């Protein structure tokens, strides 16, 4: 019994856990480094190396960016499940984000928007799939009982990366300027991908593509039913500020108070 218990404790976590921990740590390092200086960069004058946007423009861009960052993981997870697999999706996502961070270190408004698009798409491919890959590793009977603690360790990497990014961002911004601060995020993401590549032999068996089963909706139909409403509501939101529904009091009353009064 003692020998069996000892063996079980020694094999408590998959060998890939430290690699995924470090990969996620470096990815979140880059993500939160960029996010931490994003608003300041947009507001800073072009003479100082910033974008020189107005507070209103900054708010629109920042809000749109965050909204799309939280939308794309659904699409990236779907494509990984059905078509690409988790490992390939993570590599694609990491490379796109690294390219986006390096793009932000360059000047030009077009480059700025293209870089944001790359980060948004990269996050969609990366973020949901590394967590799913870790979960698949814990599906083995020998690891299943330690899944919660494994995720706790994994998420600690997020906290460490986010914490360290603040100091690195401040150091590079103060001493070398905006470009080097964004480039540091790109190098962090590349380091994470190097660590992930080293884990290939430990994660291969967990990288599975789920075949469609009878009754499943096709990938094309899922994308249709998600993307069309997204663009429709996006256009509606763009048009609303120019009319009566553009004030907080009116739309809150129409869409919030009236249904409550009607049904309750």
Give the residues covered by each predicted segment.
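Hydrophobic core of transmembrane alpha-helices in multi-pass small-molecule transporters
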Residues: 100, 111-126
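C-terminal ends and interior cores of transmembrane alpha-helices
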Residues: 92-113
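Interfacial helix-cap and linker-helix signal at transmembrane-aqueous boundaries
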Residues: 42-43, 79-81, 103, 168-177
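Central cavity-lining transmembrane alpha-helices of secondary-active solute carriers
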Residues: 59-81, 127
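Intracellular juxtamembrane helix-capping segments at the cytosolic ends
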Residues: 125-141
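Short amphipathic helix-loop junctions that connect adjacent transmembrane helices
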Residues: 34-59, 245-246
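Intracellular loop-helix junctions on the cytosolic face of multi-pass helical membrane proteins
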Residues: 1-19, 141, 170-264
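Primarily marks hydrophobic transmembrane alpha-helices of the MFS/SLC 12-helix fold
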Residues: 89-90, 151
């Amino acid at each position: 019994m003692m020998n069996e218990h000892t063996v079980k404790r020694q094999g408590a976590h998959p060998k890939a856990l430290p690699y995924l921990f470090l990969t996620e740590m470096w990815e979140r390092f880059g993500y939160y480094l960029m996010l931490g200086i994003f608003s300041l960069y947009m507001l800073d004058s072009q003479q100082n190396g910033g974008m020189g946007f107005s507070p209103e423009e900054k708010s629109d861009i920042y809000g749109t960016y965050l909204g799309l960052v939280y939308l794309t993981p659904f699409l990236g997870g779907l494509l990984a499940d059905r078509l690409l697999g988790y490992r390939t999706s993570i590599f694609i996502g990491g490379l796109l984000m690294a390219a986006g961070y390096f793009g932000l270190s360059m000047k030009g408004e077009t480059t700025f928007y293209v870089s944001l698009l790359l980060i948004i798409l990269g996050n969609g491919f990366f973020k949901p799939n590394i967590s799913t890959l870790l979960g698949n590793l814990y599906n083995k009977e020998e690891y299943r009982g330690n899944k919660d603690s494994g995720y706790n360790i994994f998420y600690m990497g997020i906290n460490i990366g986010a914490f360290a990014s603040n100091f690195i961002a401040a150091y590079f911004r103060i001493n070398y300027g905006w470009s080097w601060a964004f480039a540091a995020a790109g190098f962090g993401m590349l380091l994470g991908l190097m660590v992930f590549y080293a884990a290939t032999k430990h994660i291969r068996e967990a990288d599975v593509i789920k075949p469609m089963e009878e009754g499943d909706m096709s990938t094309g139909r899922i994308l249709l039913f998600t993307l069309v409403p997204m663009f429709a509501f996006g256009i509606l939101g763009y048009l609303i500020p120019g009319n009566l529904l553009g004030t907080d009091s009116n739309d809150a009353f129409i869409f919030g108070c009236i249904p409550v009064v009607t049904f309750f």
